[in-house]
Design a protein with these regions (language model features):
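Short, low-complexity, intrinsically disordered N-terminal peptides in bacterial proteins
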Residues: 1-11, 35-38, 283
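An alpha-helical support segment within catalytic cores of ATP-dependent transferases
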Residues: 2-8, 113-188, 199, 241
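Conserved N-terminal boundary motif of the eukaryotic protein kinase catalytic domain
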Residues: 12-19
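ATP-binding pocket architecture of kinase catalytic cores
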Residues: 20-140
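Short, solvent-exposed loop/turn segments at secondary-structure junctions
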Residues: 47, 78-82, 90-91, 147, ...
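Active-site Asp-x-Gly
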Residues: 51, 136-143, 182-186, 193, ...
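An acidic site on a long C-lobe helix of protein kinase domains
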Residues: 97, 190, 254-257
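A conserved long alpha-helix in the C-terminal portion of kinase-like catalytic domains
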Residues: 149-173, 177, 215-218, 222-285
């Protein structure tokens, strides 16, 4: 079934064209232009990885919005085959946008502190299920459900080999020494900068979440996985001022970033250097 047919079945019968958009890695996405209404954002999978993939994404967007942090788009349709959202705008140029985003993200993280790590249901990171079983120990949660869970993936096993696997296991055993003990808070969970857009009035808005309650630094590390644009230089300073984040977070970042690098290696033939980065991070272990 084509995207136009799926949209028509969902009630959008006035769509004339669907303009593909780039930036996403796991799904097909586009802007649906309509005869009698505003354009909307649409997302589909040729072969959905699960029946609940869009339902849990919609729920994640709702949770982020309810927390009063960065904005999220309105969900118009979320079924097995289709996600339709109100259309957001590209990020505006300039430091002011990133400073506003820092304030909103700091509010999200500081206002949602939670006694446990996880989420009330599993969700998805790309086309792989993200296990969110509740845990009281953040180190055990991150080790089991965010790092070691990737070792069963064939591409990860091939990239790491026996020595790399053992190094990752040793690193996980030492997480309480390597990372500070921090509370859980609500996180976006897939916060690379392509998932940061803008509302009409220039406020930061987020898409494509993989929410859970975990360390706030998971979001920061993900945002820094690719070099931030020059206009974002004040983002981290503003965030630190509002949250009390210590200067050592940058040195911890490569360990936390292992999660997204492992996810990339697991899911894509072209890993954009992720396997090499993983091996470099694991080398001391």
């Amino acid at each position: 079934m084509t995207v136009l047919e799926r949209l028509s079945r969902a009630g959008f019968r006035d769509v004339t064209t669907v303009e593909p958009v780039t930036g996403g890695l796991a799904a097909d996405a586009g802007i649906a232009h309509r005869e009698h209404g505003p354009p909307v954002f649409v997302k589909t999978f040729a072969d959905p990885p699960g029946d609940d993939v869009f339902a849990v994404e919609a729920e994640g967007l709702a949770a982020l919005r309810a927390a009063g942090g960065p904005a999220t788009p309105d969900v118009l349709v979320a079924d097995r085959e289709l996600l339709v959202l109100t259309l957001l705008r590209p990020r505006p140029a300039g430091e002011a946008f990133w400073e506003r985003f820092a304030v909103a993200l700091a509010h999200l993280h500081t206002s949602t502190v939670h006694p446990r790590f996880g989420w009330h249901r599993d969700n998805w990171l790309g086309q792989r299920r993200q296990v969110n079983t509740w845990a009281g120990d953040g180190f055990a949660f991150f080790a089991e459900h965010r790092l070691l869970r990737w070792l069963s993936e064939p591409r990860v096993a091939a990239a790491l080999g026996v020595e790399g696997r053992a190094a990752l296991e040793r690193l996980c055993a030492r997480l309480p020494e390597l990372l500070p003990e921090r509370p859980a808070c609500l996180t976006h969970g897939d916060l690379w900068r392509q998932n940061v857009l803008s509302t009409e009035d220039g406020q930061a808005a987020l898409i494509d979440p993989a929410v859970s309650y975990t360390w706030a630094e998971v979001d920061l590390a993900h945002l820094w996985t690719t070099a931030p644009p020059p206009e974002a230089r004040r983002f981290f300073d503003v965030y630190a001022e509002l949250t009390g984040l210590d200067d050592g977070w940058r040195s911890r970042m490569p360990i936390i970033q292992l999660r997204q690098h492992l996810a990339v290696v697991a899911q894509f033939d072209d890993d954009w250097g992720a396997a090499e980065t993983i091996r470099a991070t694991l080398a001391p272990f």
